[in-house]
Amino acid sequence: MIEVKRGLDLPIAGSPEQRIDDASPVRHVAILGTDYVGMKPTMEVREGDKVKLGQLLFTDKKVPGVRFTAPGAGEVVAINRGEKRRLLSVVIKLDDNEEAVSFTAHGEQALDGLDRQAVVDQLVDSGLWTALRTRPFSRTPAPDAVPADIFVTAIDTHPLSADPSVVIEEDKAAFEHGLKVLKRLTPGKVFVCHQQGAEIPGSQLEGVQHEAFAGRHPAGLVGTHIHFLSPVSLGRKVWHLDYQDVIAFGKLFVEGRLDTRRVIAVGGPRAKHPRLLRTRLGASSSELLDGEIEAPDDTRVISGSVFGGEIAEGSRRFLGRFHRQFTLLEEGNKRAFLGWLSPGLRRHSVMGIYVSQFLGLNQYAPNTSTNGSERAMVPVGAYERVMPLDIMPTQLLRSLIVGDIETSMQLGCLELDEEDLALCTYVCPGKYEYGPILRDNLTMIEKEA
């Protein structure tokens, strides 16, 4: 067991009840192009085309062979693009009776004997290959690449998240089948990282190693797991994926169907009934959350966590591919008179500067305000309080800000993704957004190194 002692469990109100309810049906689903780092699409459909569940929508010019398939059957009603023709989303209006592309059903007994190339081909054809991401760089792997190890994230320490063991309990067999499929992809180990005390199936499988983590966030981040168990470098890559995608892998190979069902958490101070909902990949947030939000006109809907999620609005008003929650917060569009003099009766700070820490409050209802503008980076030890990895965060962040990629690599930036620096952003007195800064540096490293 690995215990994470440095970090932060944000005491935010609206924690979801750990029971699964069926969500209201949605009429629109989407693939969000911004979920895939560096992806440049070659479109295979146009607006107005009819598609089946699992049918090809577009391929990736940057990674030949990678296919992105429809998360639902119906009509392609919008292909949204942003600056420089960047793909934002492909929106599908669902049919009442969805047709689906069928795939080969191998059955349970055949999983151990599957050929690696057959596994790769079926994952690519179904579009489930895009559930895999590399570390470093967090890109969709090439179909001919081979990882040193594969990490399954079966723990979630984000604020207001779902308990993975509750979700896996309903699909134990499919989860084990998915682990067997993953083992065909790597000569190394398949690490299943979970909460201490959680009963996660598959520990008896050959080549599968269960690892327990305990402590504060980011104990549930794959970057933390990789750092302690199988560090990466430019010449050594690992892959990772979410536990619900493992279940989908198992169902694809045993039943021959693409399972797009997902369980997500809905929580936050503005959630009427914080709980777990069973919905589907790419679900429309406006349709899914209809009737779930208090004061919807003054609420920000975040696909993902408060630390690393994306605002679900406009062409991105859908569940992100790698998100497992919606967080509902009050918009921070009001200014407090002399707010900097406030004693902070109901405000949270890791630096202990508010009276609230002496009042014993264990839940807060924050809004989206940053409580100040950008300013100089001030090294006051805040980053060290929330960084459990064996790196020097202040020095690393400084090198990232100035774009010193050589120093950043020496200080460990290749192990990180945007979510790994989210806590540094939260505690930063200078209001820096370190996630985008890290991504810019990783892009430069990938081009030059």
Swiss-Prot record:
EC number: 7.2.1.1
Catalysis performed (reactions): a ubiquinone + n Na(+)(in) + NADH + H(+) = a ubiquinol + n Na(+)(out) + NAD(+)
An annotated GO BP: sodium ion transport
Keyword Transport (UniProt): yes
Pfam families from the UniProt entry: NQRA_2nd, NQRA_N, NQRA_SLBB
Superkingdom of this protein's organism: Bacteria
GO MF entries: oxidoreductase activity, acting on NAD(P)H, quinone or similar compound as acceptor
Keywords, ordered alphabetically: Ion transport, NAD, Sodium, Sodium transport, Translocase, Transport, Ubiquinone
Residues that span the membrane, as ranges: none
Function text: NQR complex catalyzes the reduction of ubiquinone-1 to ubiquinol by two successive reactions, coupled with the transport of Na(+) ions from the cytoplasm to the periplasm. NqrA to NqrE are probably involved in the second step, the conversion of ubisemiquinone to ubiquinol.
HAMAP family: NqrA
Assembly and interaction partners: Composed of six subunits; NqrA, NqrB, NqrC, NqrD, NqrE and NqrF.
Family of this protein: Belongs to the NqrA family.
Protein's name according to its UniProt entry: Na(+)-translocating NADH-quinone reductase subunit A
Source species: Chromohalobacter salexigens (strain ATCC BAA-138 / DSM 3043 / CIP 106854 / NCIMB 13768 / 1H11)
Gene field: nqrA
